[in-house]
Amino acid sequence: MNNVLTTEIAGRELKVEFGKVGMLSNAATFTSYGDTVILTNVNASEQPREGIDFFPLSVEYEERLYAVGKIPGGFIKREGRPSEKAILNGRAVDRTLRPLFPKGYRNDVQVVTTVVSVEKDNLPEILAINAASLALCLSSIPYTIPAAAVQVGIIDGKFVTNPDTQGREKSILHLTVCATKERVMMIEAGGQEIPEDTMIDAIKYGFDECQKIIAFQEEAVAKFGKKKDEPVLYAVDPELEKDVKEFASDMIKEAMYIMEKDERNAAVDAVYEKVNEAFGEKYADKMGDIKEVLYTMQKKVVRHMLLKDKRRPDGRAFDQIRPLGCEIGILPRTHGTGLFTRGLTQVMTVATLGSISEIQILDGIDEAQSKRYMHHYNFPGYSVGEVKPLRGPGRREIGHGALAERALEPLIPSEEEFPYTIRLVSEVLSSNGSTSQASVCGSTLALLDAGVPIKRPAAGIAMGLITSEDLSEEAVLTDIQGIEDFFGDMDFKVAGTTEGITSIQVDTKLQGFSFNVVENAIRDARKARLTIIDKINECISTPKEDVSLYAPKTQIMSINPDKIRDVIGAGGKVINKIIQDTGVKIDIKEDGTVFVSSTDHNGVNEAIKIIEGLTKEVKAGEVYLGKVTKITTFGAFVEILPSKEGLVHISKLAKERVNKVEDVVSIGDEILVKVTEIDNQGRINLSRKDALVEQENKEEK
């Protein structure tokens, strides 16, 4: 039986079809917004997974190129690994839904959202969050709290819900708000230096817009939702919990109140060893329970420390930043480097400048076709003092890299202002909280060191939240470190400049957070951000005047678009010869803009000279110094400009009569010629005789 329900959101139809497809899934839906369609399937294992201390939720965001009428490139002609955008979209779905499952639920749950049709005006990533929540609510899986998502833009000073393609191009804000009926769940934002008050209002606007979609989900559940399964929730053995708490409570408290990180960790490890020695035999098959109890005890101590004692694990005030350090130019051959240190968190960011041809080509369902500015983030095991295999970037690394990239994107100069491709790589050297925001600061330093004329310096800070069990008490923390992140309830990352916010990413372990938290976090983040920017300015306040000696030099020139074919030549013959002869890289745009790049300045000048010659218009009546390229019985062909030849008839070779062309010129001779005519077929007629006469007349004068 196909159950259908529709509503209208921002002037477009939101529709769900349940029961039509995926009959063997716990729940399968077609959810559409306009002509964008998401196929969602949700399933759960029948029994909890044994021996784990986490909720095994798997969220997959699958892109199908047929959704936009494309055939995948390459030899195989099918979709391969997920794109970075798909990974980020999957993370957004996961971060919204995960806290809403029952605490202690250990059954494997898989949510698969497959993009099967895309209308450019309606973003599939927004629909995927709504579709996933809706499918879970309709299923028998014990997920009962609907969550909704909208995108908020600012166009001509007004908030707009789910702007279309044209609207997104105009909008100065790209904000995703995910919420339940009562609280905000997740925030993602990128903006052009948005003032704090405006951002807060935009989040409130987005929350209100989410309520319409939540009401739609509730209506769907009431009409055709499945009966929910009774969850089997993980619970610690009460006797074990009592024994461990009585034995270790005082020791845990004493250890957690140690301010120095390494000393505190060593003390906690010692407590764990003592507990294992004391109860290892009695609870040999319940070591996971012991670990869970100790974790809960640590968390309780940290919460009491913050909410009751009003002190942080390292003794800082709630709004205090750890000691800061900034350095530039620490690597001799790179194009730009920035070393940013905040407490025990340290990131080195390296900037590399390349030619315009080195942009990243994107092959996916996204609107963007290429990227000129990119940021990559690496988080090796040594950054936390651990031994880990070095593999490719995971979801976390991709997410952190994209977040720092978004923070700087509005500040990057245009292609016309700075004709380079820009790649930043942030290497996390030491991690004790908020390395993604340290990457923003390191990126600013590296860009300024590389001579990139960004609008102004940017910085990022991570805010945290600690709440009481009943949520009656809460404390917002500035610049959270590892222990506060681990035992805390929220990670609220804000980046921007002195003028406003350029990026936000917020997720929580709770079932949402209040607007009071949103306001306090955003306002406190500004104070911290300005402090960090002051420190950056002490190190380097403006971009270096010149790019590195080891960076390519790029010059821009404009040519008539009709002349592009002359520069490229048949099969690329002409442009390839220029590249081969001068050692440059050449990029030509459809509007006739030409970018010439090389580390050899002389090569750039030579290439520009050749291109100018190729595109210069031959004019009748002008005199040129040309080279004889071919001799026939009736005259000589002379190249007056690159790839432009004309004929000097034998009668026009000299003032006197010429019997044989070879008597006057030979191949390779350079001679003065005058353009006498360009016929309607573009053929150029030349005269050496007229050029000689004109030259003699000038000499007589």
Swiss-Prot record:
Domain S1 motif: 621-689
Domain KH: 552-611
Record CDD domains: KH-I_PNPase, RNase_PH_PNPase_1, RNase_PH_PNPase_2, S1_PNPase
Keyword Metal-binding: yes
GO CC aspect terms: cytosol
Localization terms from the record: Cytoplasm
Protein family membership: Belongs to the polyribonucleotide nucleotidyltransferase family.
Function: Involved in mRNA degradation. Catalyzes the phosphorolysis of single-stranded polyribonucleotides processively in the 3'- to 5'-direction.
PANTHER family noted in UniProt: POLYRIBONUCLEOTIDE NUCLEOTIDYLTRANSFERASE, POLYRIBONUCLEOTIDE NUCLEOTIDYLTRANSFERASE 1, MITOCHONDRIAL
UniProt-recorded name of the protein: Polyribonucleotide nucleotidyltransferase
Gene: pnp
